[in-house]
Protein backbone atom coordinates (compact mmCIF):
# COMPACT_ATOMS: atom_id res chain seq x y z
CA UNK A 1 0.00 0.00 0.00
CA UNK A 2 1.37 3.41 -0.98
CA UNK A 3 1.50 6.09 1.68
CA UNK A 4 1.22 9.71 0.58
CA UNK A 5 2.85 12.22 2.89
CA UNK A 6 1.26 15.67 2.80
CA UNK A 7 3.62 18.48 3.70
CA UNK A 8 2.26 20.89 6.24
CA UNK A 9 2.29 24.57 5.30
CA UNK A 10 2.82 27.22 7.92
CA UNK A 11 1.19 30.66 7.85
CA UNK A 12 2.56 32.11 11.04
CA UNK A 13 0.44 32.49 14.12
CA UNK A 14 -2.86 34.00 15.19
CA UNK A 15 -3.47 34.97 18.82
CA UNK A 16 -0.69 32.64 19.89
CA UNK A 17 -1.93 29.70 17.79
CA UNK A 18 0.02 28.31 14.84
CA UNK A 19 -1.81 28.62 11.49
CA UNK A 20 -1.13 25.38 9.58
CA UNK A 21 -2.46 23.99 6.28
CA UNK A 22 -2.14 20.73 4.38
CA UNK A 23 -3.64 19.03 1.33
CA UNK A 24 -5.49 16.15 2.98
CA UNK A 25 -8.95 17.73 3.09
CA UNK A 26 -10.43 15.17 0.72
CA UNK A 27 -12.13 15.55 -2.66
CA UNK A 28 -12.69 19.30 -2.63
CA UNK A 29 -13.66 21.44 -5.59
CA UNK A 30 -13.97 25.16 -6.21
CA UNK A 31 -16.65 24.76 -8.91
CA UNK A 32 -19.54 23.04 -7.13
CA UNK A 33 -22.00 25.63 -8.44
CA UNK A 34 -21.49 24.15 -11.88
CA UNK A 35 -24.14 21.62 -10.93
CA UNK A 36 -26.66 24.35 -11.78
CA UNK A 37 -25.42 24.13 -15.36
CA UNK A 38 -25.85 20.35 -15.24
CA UNK A 39 -29.49 20.85 -14.21
CA UNK A 40 -30.07 23.39 -16.98
CA UNK A 41 -28.44 21.16 -19.55
CA UNK A 42 -30.55 18.24 -18.40
CA UNK A 43 -33.72 20.24 -19.05
CA UNK A 44 -32.75 21.66 -22.44
CA UNK A 45 -30.42 18.93 -23.73
CA UNK A 46 -27.88 21.36 -25.17
CA UNK A 47 -24.79 19.16 -24.87
CA UNK A 48 -26.60 15.95 -25.78
CA UNK A 49 -28.01 17.57 -28.92
CA UNK A 50 -24.58 18.91 -29.85
CA UNK A 51 -23.08 15.44 -29.41
CA UNK A 52 -25.66 14.00 -31.82
CA UNK A 53 -24.38 16.38 -34.49
CA UNK A 54 -20.92 14.81 -34.46
CA UNK A 55 -19.51 11.74 -36.15
CA UNK A 56 -17.30 9.29 -34.26
CA UNK A 57 -14.98 7.22 -36.48
CA UNK A 58 -13.35 5.49 -33.50
CA UNK A 59 -13.71 1.75 -32.93
CA UNK A 60 -16.24 1.30 -30.15
CA UNK A 61 -14.16 -1.24 -28.27
CA UNK A 62 -11.34 1.30 -27.93
CA UNK A 63 -13.46 4.22 -26.76
CA UNK A 64 -13.07 5.35 -23.15
CA UNK A 65 -14.53 8.85 -23.49
CA UNK A 66 -17.65 8.91 -25.68
CA UNK A 67 -18.72 11.99 -27.64
CA UNK A 68 -21.34 13.02 -25.11
CA UNK A 69 -18.79 13.03 -22.28
CA UNK A 70 -16.19 14.89 -24.36
CA UNK A 71 -18.55 17.64 -25.41
CA UNK A 72 -19.93 18.00 -21.87
CA UNK A 73 -16.39 18.26 -20.54
CA UNK A 74 -15.47 21.01 -23.01
CA UNK A 75 -18.67 23.07 -22.77
CA UNK A 76 -18.91 22.90 -18.98
CA UNK A 77 -15.20 23.69 -18.61
CA UNK A 78 -15.57 26.77 -20.81
CA UNK A 79 -18.61 27.93 -18.85
CA UNK A 80 -16.63 27.55 -15.61
CA UNK A 81 -13.79 29.67 -16.98
CA UNK A 82 -11.40 26.97 -18.22
CA UNK A 83 -11.34 27.70 -21.94
CA UNK A 84 -8.10 25.94 -22.91
CA UNK A 85 -7.83 22.20 -23.52
CA UNK A 86 -4.59 22.42 -21.54
CA UNK A 87 -6.75 22.99 -18.46
CA UNK A 88 -7.93 19.37 -18.74
CA UNK A 89 -4.53 18.20 -17.53
CA UNK A 90 -5.22 19.55 -14.05
CA UNK A 91 -9.04 19.35 -14.04
CA UNK A 92 -9.73 15.86 -15.40
CA UNK A 93 -10.03 14.48 -11.84
CA UNK A 94 -12.03 17.41 -10.42
CA UNK A 95 -15.01 15.85 -8.59
CA UNK A 96 -17.49 18.57 -9.58
CA UNK A 97 -16.60 18.44 -13.27
CA UNK A 98 -16.80 14.64 -13.23
CA UNK A 99 -20.25 14.82 -11.63
CA UNK A 100 -21.38 17.38 -14.20
CA UNK A 101 -20.32 15.05 -17.03
CA UNK A 102 -22.26 12.10 -15.56
CA UNK A 103 -19.28 10.35 -13.97
CA UNK A 104 -19.02 9.39 -10.31
CA UNK A 105 -16.62 11.75 -8.54
CA UNK A 106 -14.44 9.08 -6.91
CA UNK A 107 -14.97 5.64 -8.43
CA UNK A 108 -15.30 6.56 -12.13
CA UNK A 109 -12.40 7.07 -14.51
CA UNK A 110 -10.94 10.55 -14.83
CA UNK A 111 -12.07 12.74 -17.72
CA UNK A 112 -10.26 13.13 -21.04
CA UNK A 113 -6.74 14.54 -21.26
CA UNK A 114 -5.59 17.46 -23.39
CA UNK A 115 -4.38 15.25 -26.31
CA UNK A 116 -7.73 13.43 -26.41
CA UNK A 117 -9.64 16.73 -26.49
CA UNK A 118 -7.33 18.08 -29.19
CA UNK A 119 -8.00 15.05 -31.41
CA UNK A 120 -11.71 15.40 -30.65
CA UNK A 121 -11.79 19.01 -31.88
CA UNK A 122 -9.73 18.35 -34.98
CA UNK A 123 -11.89 15.42 -36.16
CA UNK A 124 -14.89 17.65 -36.88
CA UNK A 125 -16.27 17.67 -40.44
CA UNK A 126 -18.09 20.29 -42.49
CA UNK A 127 -21.30 18.25 -42.29
CA UNK A 128 -21.06 18.13 -38.50
CA UNK A 129 -20.56 21.90 -38.38
CA UNK A 130 -23.70 22.42 -40.48
CA UNK A 131 -25.63 20.20 -38.07
CA UNK A 132 -24.28 22.22 -35.13
CA UNK A 133 -25.51 25.41 -36.81
CA UNK A 134 -28.97 23.85 -37.09
CA UNK A 135 -28.85 22.70 -33.48
CA UNK A 136 -27.95 26.19 -32.22
CA UNK A 137 -31.07 27.52 -33.92
CA UNK A 138 -33.16 24.67 -32.47
CA UNK A 139 -31.91 25.60 -29.00
CA UNK A 140 -32.96 29.18 -29.71
CA UNK A 141 -36.49 28.04 -30.61
CA UNK A 142 -36.69 25.79 -27.52
CA UNK A 143 -35.74 28.70 -25.27
CA UNK A 144 -38.03 31.21 -27.01
CA UNK A 145 -41.50 29.63 -27.22
CA UNK A 146 -44.12 31.30 -29.39
CA UNK A 147 -46.35 32.95 -30.30
CA UNK A 148 -44.29 36.12 -30.63
CA UNK A 149 -45.24 39.53 -31.96
CA UNK A 150 -41.79 40.83 -32.93
CA UNK A 151 -38.38 39.26 -33.52
CA UNK A 152 -35.38 41.55 -33.80
CA UNK A 153 -32.29 40.19 -35.56
CA UNK A 154 -29.00 41.88 -34.72
CA UNK A 155 -26.02 41.01 -36.91
CA UNK A 156 -22.45 42.09 -36.26
CA UNK A 157 -18.85 41.10 -36.91
CA UNK A 158 -15.79 41.19 -34.69
CA UNK A 159 -12.07 40.53 -34.84
CA UNK A 160 -10.27 37.47 -33.48
CA UNK A 161 -6.47 37.90 -33.54
CA UNK A 162 -4.56 34.86 -34.82
CA UNK A 163 -1.03 33.67 -34.20
CA UNK A 164 1.41 31.65 -36.26
CA UNK A 165 0.40 29.80 -39.42
CA UNK A 166 -3.27 29.18 -38.68
CA UNK A 167 -5.38 28.23 -41.68
CA UNK A 168 -7.19 31.18 -43.33
CA UNK A 169 -5.54 33.70 -41.04
CA UNK A 170 -5.09 36.93 -43.02
CA UNK A 171 -4.23 40.55 -42.41
CA UNK A 172 -7.23 42.88 -42.15
CA UNK A 173 -6.55 46.50 -43.00
CA UNK A 174 -9.26 47.99 -40.78
CA UNK A 175 -8.19 46.13 -37.64
CA UNK A 176 -4.51 46.20 -38.65
CA UNK A 177 -3.82 42.65 -37.51
CA UNK A 178 -3.77 39.04 -38.67
CA UNK A 179 -7.10 37.61 -37.62
CA UNK A 180 -10.27 35.64 -38.17
CA UNK A 181 -13.46 37.62 -38.80
CA UNK A 182 -16.36 35.91 -36.95
CA UNK A 183 -19.97 36.80 -37.77
CA UNK A 184 -22.55 36.73 -34.96
CA UNK A 185 -26.34 36.94 -35.10
CA UNK A 186 -28.33 37.53 -31.90
CA UNK A 187 -31.93 37.94 -30.90
CA UNK A 188 -31.94 41.70 -30.39
CA UNK A 189 -34.46 41.54 -27.55
CA UNK A 190 -33.23 38.61 -25.46
CA UNK A 191 -29.56 38.60 -26.46
CA UNK A 192 -29.57 34.87 -27.30
CA UNK A 193 -27.20 33.79 -30.11
CA UNK A 194 -28.85 32.52 -33.29
CA UNK A 195 -25.73 31.92 -35.39
CA UNK A 196 -21.94 32.15 -35.19
CA UNK A 197 -19.89 31.85 -38.35
CA UNK A 198 -16.09 31.85 -38.47
CA UNK A 199 -14.69 33.54 -41.58
CA UNK A 200 -11.22 34.16 -43.03
CA UNK A 201 -9.47 37.24 -41.73
CA UNK A 202 -9.53 39.26 -44.95
CA UNK A 203 -13.28 39.15 -45.54
CA UNK A 204 -15.62 42.13 -45.57
CA UNK A 205 -17.91 42.54 -42.56
CA UNK A 206 -20.94 41.57 -44.68
CA UNK A 207 -19.32 38.46 -46.23
CA UNK A 208 -21.77 35.51 -46.22
CA UNK A 209 -24.37 37.58 -44.38
CA UNK A 210 -26.99 37.30 -47.12
CA UNK A 211 -26.79 33.50 -47.32
CA UNK A 212 -26.87 33.09 -43.53
CA UNK A 213 -29.73 35.55 -43.08
CA UNK A 214 -31.79 34.08 -45.91
CA UNK A 215 -31.68 30.65 -44.30
CA UNK A 216 -32.31 32.11 -40.85
CA UNK A 217 -35.32 34.14 -42.01
CA UNK A 218 -36.86 31.07 -43.61
CA UNK A 219 -36.53 29.11 -40.38
CA UNK A 220 -37.82 31.99 -38.25
CA UNK A 221 -40.92 32.32 -40.41
CA UNK A 222 -41.57 28.61 -40.05
CA UNK A 223 -41.09 28.65 -36.27
CA UNK A 224 -42.92 31.95 -35.67
CA UNK A 225 -45.31 32.55 -38.60
CA UNK A 226 -47.17 35.26 -36.68
CA UNK A 227 -44.09 37.36 -35.85
CA UNK A 228 -42.92 40.58 -37.48
CA UNK A 229 -39.17 40.39 -38.14
CA UNK A 230 -36.80 43.37 -37.95
CA UNK A 231 -33.13 43.33 -38.99
CA UNK A 232 -30.65 45.77 -37.41
CA UNK A 233 -27.03 46.27 -38.42
CA UNK A 234 -24.30 48.88 -38.51
CA UNK A 235 -22.69 50.42 -41.59
CA UNK A 236 -20.50 47.37 -42.14
CA UNK A 237 -23.62 45.68 -43.55
CA UNK A 238 -24.74 48.60 -45.73
CA UNK A 239 -24.82 46.55 -48.93
CA UNK A 240 -27.68 46.51 -51.48
CA UNK A 241 -28.00 42.72 -51.44
CA UNK A 242 -29.18 42.83 -47.82
CA UNK A 243 -31.75 45.57 -48.51
CA UNK A 244 -33.08 43.60 -51.46
CA UNK A 245 -33.21 40.36 -49.46
CA UNK A 246 -35.27 42.00 -46.71
CA UNK A 247 -37.63 43.61 -49.21
CA UNK A 248 -38.15 40.31 -51.04
CA UNK A 249 -38.75 38.41 -47.79
CA UNK A 250 -41.05 41.03 -46.26
CA UNK A 251 -38.57 41.83 -43.48
CA UNK A 252 -38.22 45.27 -41.89
CA UNK A 253 -34.69 46.62 -41.65
CA UNK A 254 -32.74 49.54 -40.25
CA UNK A 255 -29.07 49.58 -41.25
CA UNK A 256 -26.40 52.21 -40.71
CA UNK A 257 -24.85 54.02 -43.67
CA UNK A 258 -21.31 55.26 -44.16
CA UNK A 259 -21.40 59.05 -44.32
CA UNK A 260 -20.56 60.52 -47.74
CA UNK A 261 -20.74 63.90 -49.47
CA UNK A 262 -24.11 63.23 -51.09
CA UNK A 263 -25.72 62.36 -47.76
CA UNK A 264 -24.19 65.46 -46.19
CA UNK A 265 -25.57 67.56 -49.03
CA UNK A 266 -29.07 66.11 -48.53
CA UNK A 267 -28.93 67.02 -44.82
CA UNK A 268 -27.12 70.37 -45.13
CA UNK A 269 -30.24 72.36 -44.26
CA UNK A 270 -30.74 70.32 -41.08
CA UNK A 271 -27.11 70.87 -40.08
CA UNK A 272 -27.41 74.63 -40.60
CA UNK A 273 -30.54 74.68 -38.44
CA UNK A 274 -28.84 72.70 -35.65
CA UNK A 275 -25.83 75.04 -35.73
CA UNK A 276 -28.02 78.12 -35.55
CA UNK A 277 -30.00 76.78 -32.59
CA UNK A 278 -26.80 75.83 -30.77
CA UNK A 279 -25.31 79.31 -31.25
CA UNK A 280 -28.51 80.86 -29.92
CA UNK A 281 -28.95 78.60 -26.90
CA UNK A 282 -25.45 77.36 -26.14
CA UNK A 283 -26.93 73.90 -25.58
CA UNK A 284 -26.40 70.72 -27.56
CA UNK A 285 -28.86 70.35 -30.45
CA UNK A 286 -30.14 67.04 -31.78
CA UNK A 287 -32.34 67.10 -34.90
CA UNK A 288 -33.75 64.47 -37.25
CA UNK A 289 -35.12 64.31 -40.76
CA UNK A 290 -35.79 61.75 -43.48
CA UNK A 291 -35.49 61.80 -47.26
CA UNK A 292 -35.43 59.49 -50.25
CA UNK A 293 -31.98 58.57 -51.50
CA UNK A 294 -30.46 56.30 -54.13
CA UNK A 295 -26.76 55.43 -54.14
CA UNK A 296 -25.13 54.55 -57.45
CA UNK A 297 -25.10 50.85 -56.53
CA UNK A 298 -28.79 50.78 -55.53
CA UNK A 299 -31.53 49.69 -57.90
CA UNK A 300 -34.10 52.04 -56.39
CA UNK A 301 -34.70 54.92 -54.01
CA UNK A 302 -34.90 54.08 -50.31
CA UNK A 303 -35.79 56.00 -47.16
CA UNK A 304 -32.85 57.42 -45.21
CA UNK A 305 -32.99 58.84 -41.67
CA UNK A 306 -30.50 61.59 -40.83
CA UNK A 307 -29.51 62.44 -37.27
CA UNK A 308 -27.60 65.70 -36.79
CA UNK A 309 -26.08 66.80 -33.51
CA UNK A 310 -24.32 70.10 -32.88
CA UNK A 311 -22.31 70.79 -29.72
CA UNK A 312 -19.11 72.42 -28.45
CA UNK A 313 -16.97 70.00 -30.45
CA UNK A 314 -18.90 70.66 -33.65
CA UNK A 315 -21.22 68.54 -35.77
CA UNK A 316 -21.94 64.83 -35.49
CA UNK A 317 -24.02 63.27 -38.26
CA UNK A 318 -25.33 59.72 -38.64
CA UNK A 319 -27.44 58.11 -41.37
CA UNK A 320 -29.47 54.90 -41.53
CA UNK A 321 -31.43 53.31 -44.35
CA UNK A 322 -34.77 51.71 -43.54
CA UNK A 323 -38.10 50.50 -44.86
CA UNK A 324 -39.90 51.14 -41.55
CA UNK A 325 -42.54 53.89 -41.59
CA UNK A 326 -41.90 55.54 -38.23
CA UNK A 327 -41.00 59.10 -37.30
CA UNK A 328 -37.24 59.63 -37.74
CA UNK A 329 -36.31 60.24 -34.10
CA UNK A 330 -38.45 57.41 -32.78
CA UNK A 331 -37.01 54.97 -35.31
CA UNK A 332 -33.45 56.02 -34.50
CA UNK A 333 -33.75 56.15 -30.71
CA UNK A 334 -36.18 53.30 -30.06
CA UNK A 335 -35.00 50.81 -32.68
CA UNK A 336 -31.60 51.48 -34.21
CA UNK A 337 -29.67 52.69 -31.15
CA UNK A 338 -30.61 49.56 -29.17
CA UNK A 339 -28.53 47.59 -31.67
CA UNK A 340 -25.56 48.54 -29.50
CA UNK A 341 -26.55 45.85 -26.98
CA UNK A 342 -25.26 43.27 -29.45
CA UNK A 343 -21.78 44.67 -28.99
CA UNK A 344 -22.14 43.98 -25.27
CA UNK A 345 -23.09 40.37 -25.99
CA UNK A 346 -20.01 39.99 -28.19
CA UNK A 347 -17.89 41.49 -25.42
CA UNK A 348 -19.30 38.90 -23.02
CA UNK A 349 -18.46 36.12 -25.44
CA UNK A 350 -14.92 37.37 -25.92
CA UNK A 351 -14.03 38.61 -22.44
CA UNK A 352 -15.94 36.18 -20.21
CA UNK A 353 -16.38 33.06 -22.37
CA UNK A 354 -13.09 33.57 -24.25
CA UNK A 355 -14.78 32.83 -27.58
CA UNK A 356 -11.78 34.38 -29.32
CA UNK A 357 -9.47 31.66 -27.97
CA UNK A 358 -9.39 29.90 -31.33
CA UNK A 359 -5.84 28.60 -31.30
CA UNK A 360 -6.11 25.42 -33.39
CA UNK A 361 -4.19 25.27 -36.65
CA UNK A 362 -7.14 23.81 -38.57
CA UNK A 363 -9.85 26.31 -39.57
CA UNK A 364 -12.72 23.84 -39.14
CA UNK A 365 -11.51 22.97 -35.65
CA UNK A 366 -11.64 26.66 -34.77
CA UNK A 367 -15.21 26.92 -36.09
CA UNK A 368 -16.04 23.95 -33.85
CA UNK A 369 -14.46 25.75 -30.90
CA UNK A 370 -16.57 28.81 -31.65
CA UNK A 371 -19.69 26.63 -31.36
CA UNK A 372 -18.46 25.13 -28.07
CA UNK A 373 -17.96 28.59 -26.59
CA UNK A 374 -21.35 29.74 -27.90
CA UNK A 375 -23.15 26.76 -26.35
CA UNK A 376 -21.38 27.52 -23.05
CA UNK A 377 -22.73 31.06 -23.33
CA UNK A 378 -26.23 29.65 -23.95
CA UNK A 379 -26.09 27.78 -20.63
CA UNK A 380 -25.07 30.91 -18.75
CA UNK A 381 -27.76 32.88 -20.59
CA UNK A 382 -30.33 30.33 -19.38
CA UNK A 383 -28.98 30.63 -15.84
CA UNK A 384 -29.44 34.40 -15.99
CA UNK A 385 -32.98 33.97 -17.32
CA UNK A 386 -33.80 31.89 -14.25
CA UNK A 387 -32.67 34.75 -12.02
CA UNK A 388 -35.24 37.32 -13.16
CA UNK A 389 -36.39 39.46 -10.27
CA UNK A 390 -33.12 39.01 -8.37
CA UNK A 391 -29.98 41.12 -8.05
CA UNK A 392 -28.37 39.02 -10.80
CA UNK A 393 -31.16 39.43 -13.35
CA UNK A 394 -28.97 41.60 -15.58
CA UNK A 395 -25.54 40.44 -14.41
CA UNK A 396 -22.68 39.79 -16.80
CA UNK A 397 -21.90 36.10 -17.22
CA UNK A 398 -18.58 36.63 -15.46
CA UNK A 399 -20.46 37.84 -12.39
CA UNK A 400 -22.77 34.83 -12.54
CA UNK A 401 -19.74 32.56 -12.63
CA UNK A 402 -18.07 34.19 -9.62
CA UNK A 403 -21.20 34.39 -7.46
CA UNK A 404 -23.03 31.18 -8.35
CA UNK A 405 -20.57 28.70 -9.87
CA UNK A 406 -17.35 29.24 -7.92
CA UNK A 407 -18.39 27.50 -4.71
CA UNK A 408 -16.03 25.46 -2.57
CA UNK A 409 -17.35 22.04 -1.63
CA UNK A 410 -16.27 18.63 -0.39
CA UNK A 411 -17.67 15.85 -2.54
CA UNK A 412 -17.86 12.27 -1.35
CA UNK A 413 -19.41 9.16 -2.76
CA UNK A 414 -21.24 6.45 -0.84
CA UNK A 415 -22.87 3.26 -2.03
CA UNK A 416 -26.21 5.04 -2.51
CA UNK A 417 -25.49 8.75 -2.90
CA UNK A 418 -23.10 11.42 -4.04
CA UNK A 419 -22.82 13.96 -1.22
CA UNK A 420 -21.84 17.54 -2.00
CA UNK A 421 -21.05 19.50 1.14
CA UNK A 422 -21.08 23.16 0.07
CA UNK A 423 -19.03 25.69 2.01
CA UNK A 424 -20.89 26.89 5.10
CA UNK A 425 -19.50 30.38 4.58
CA UNK A 426 -20.80 30.71 1.00
CA UNK A 427 -22.45 34.18 1.01
CA UNK A 428 -25.12 33.61 -1.67
CA UNK A 429 -26.86 30.53 -0.29
CA UNK A 430 -30.40 31.92 -0.66
CA UNK A 431 -29.74 33.09 -4.22
CA UNK A 432 -28.24 29.73 -5.17
CA UNK A 433 -31.22 27.84 -3.73
CA UNK A 434 -33.62 30.13 -5.60
CA UNK A 435 -31.73 29.60 -8.85
CA UNK A 436 -31.93 25.82 -8.46
CA UNK A 437 -35.64 26.05 -7.61
CA UNK A 438 -36.32 28.15 -10.71
CA UNK A 439 -34.28 25.85 -12.94
CA UNK A 440 -36.20 22.80 -11.76
CA UNK A 441 -39.52 24.60 -12.34
CA UNK A 442 -38.59 25.99 -15.77
CA UNK A 443 -40.65 24.71 -18.73
CA UNK A 444 -38.86 22.58 -21.31
Predicted feature residues:
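Dynamic "connector" segments at or just before major functional cores
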Residues: 1-204, 209-223, 391, 407-444
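An anionic, glycine-rich sequence signature occurring as long contiguous blocks
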Residues: 4-22, 252-354, 437-444
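Short amphipathic alpha-helical "interface-anchor" segments enriched in bulky aromatics
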Residues: 40, 88, 329-383
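Generic beta-strand/beta-sheet core signal
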Residues: 91, 156, 196, 232-234, ...
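Short, glycine-/Ser/Thr-/acidic-enriched flexible segments
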Residues: 158-160, 190, 199-201, 258-260, ...
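Domain-level cores of phosphate- or acyl-group-handling catalytic modules
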Residues: 203-262
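Basic, amphipathic alpha-helical segments enriched in Lys/Arg and hydrophobic/aromatic residues
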Residues: 355-425
Amino acid sequence: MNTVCHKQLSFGSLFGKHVTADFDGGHITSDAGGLLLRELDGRYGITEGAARCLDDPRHRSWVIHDLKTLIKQRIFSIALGYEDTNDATTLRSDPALKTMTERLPESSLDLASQPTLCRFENRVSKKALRRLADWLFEVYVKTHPGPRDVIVIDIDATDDPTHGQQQLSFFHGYYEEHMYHPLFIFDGISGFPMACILRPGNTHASHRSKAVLKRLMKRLKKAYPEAEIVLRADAGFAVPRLYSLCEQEGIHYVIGLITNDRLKEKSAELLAKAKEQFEQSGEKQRLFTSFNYQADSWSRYRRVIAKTEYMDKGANQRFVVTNIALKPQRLYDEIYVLRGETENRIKELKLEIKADRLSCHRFLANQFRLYLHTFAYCLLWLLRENLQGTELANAQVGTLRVKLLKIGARIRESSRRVWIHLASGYPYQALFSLALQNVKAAPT
